[in-house]
């Protein structure tokens, strides 16, 4: 009887609340703001730890990117910040030419891909010393990324003031964003380097990892998993966990949480950024994706988006 009253009270308290609006307010906006602050810190001191901090905060924003669906003008914004697995050209060789160019920093960085975190990684980690030229270029690159991050933040703040979608659409957006993120985690960020993806079956190669130069690929994966936890773990507001439990999906949700922990535990015991030993990590990522895409989404009665080979 007491439990029933508690559940009823909880339902009444959260009766008019919406998951996406709470996520934007409590997760998305703080994550973007943290990334902006870390970018500014990195501008002041281009060191290894500051780069890792910025990278991890950005991965959280990217993993839970709702802005492109809320305002289609910003659908491609993440690709102005990060081109991993979305670029056919050799960015590193192009950035080498940018450094050697006599043009001023803004002119030299004329392509969008030159102003991404991937380009920044090359600036900082291509050798053991950061030259004056590389510092100048890095500041311009970070200014560009900060500008895009400010735009993302504005999209979220605008939507909070005037939501334009219905609650059912919003709920579907949250779960489908988690599904797409888990697919990219499995295929792009683990499978391509570990030799478990369909594209590179039985051909493990650490050089394919997302942040091979800076040895931050595991750190990026860990940050993405932290972002997932921000959604699926219980919070003091009406959240995805409360919604899932209301729909009778508590068991399916616990499987998701367990798989995230399993992956984070495995990251701690693996040699740093060594994907040649990441079979277990890949299998856990596969289980996580299936827990979202098969079990949880079915229990929630939400239609999943069909993912193509690129996870889009």
Regions found by a protein language model. Give the residues of each.
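Mature extracytoplasmic or organellar-lumen-exposed domains after removal of signal/transit peptides
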Residues: 16-312
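Sec-dependent N-terminal signal peptides
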Residues: 2-12
């Amino acid at each position: 009887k007491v439990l029933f009253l508690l559940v009823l009270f909880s339902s009444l308290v959260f009766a008019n609340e919406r998951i996406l609006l709470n996520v934007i307010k409590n997760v998305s906006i703080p994550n973007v703001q943290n990334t902006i602050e870390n970018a500014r810190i990195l501008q002041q001191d281009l060191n290894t730890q500051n780069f890792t901090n910025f990278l991890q905060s950005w991965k959280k924003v990217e993993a839970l990117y709702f802005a492109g669906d809320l305002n289609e003008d910003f659908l491609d914004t993440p690709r102005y910040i990060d081109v991993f697995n979305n670029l056919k050209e050799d960015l590193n060789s192009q950035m080498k030419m940018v450094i050697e160019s006599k043009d001023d920093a803004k002119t030299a960085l004329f392509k969008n891909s030159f102003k991404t975190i991937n380009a920044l990684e090359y600036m900082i980690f291509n050798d053991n010393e950061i030259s004056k030229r590389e510092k100048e270029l890095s500041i311009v690159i970070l200014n560009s990324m900060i500008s895009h991050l400010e735009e993302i933040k504005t999209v979220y703040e605008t939507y909070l003031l005037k939501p334009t979608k219905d609650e059912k659409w919003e709920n579907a957006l949250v779960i489908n964003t988690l599904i797409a993120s888990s697919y990219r985690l499995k295929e792009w960020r683990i499978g391509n380097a570990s030799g478990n993806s369909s594209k590179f079956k039985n051909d493990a190669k650490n050089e394919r990892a997302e942040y091979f130069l800076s040895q931050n690929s595991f750190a990026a994966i860990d940050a993405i998993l932290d972002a997932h936890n921000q959604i699926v773990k219980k919070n003091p507001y009406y959240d995805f966990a409360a919604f899932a439990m209301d729909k009778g999906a508590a068991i399916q949700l616990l499987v998701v949480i367990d798989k995230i922990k399993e992956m984070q535990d495995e990251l701690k015991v693996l040699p740093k950024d060594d994907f040649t030993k990441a079979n277990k990590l890949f299998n856990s990522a596969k289980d996580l994706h299936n827990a979202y895409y098969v079990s949880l989404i079915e229990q929630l009665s939400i239609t999943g988006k069909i993912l193509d080979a690129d996870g889009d």
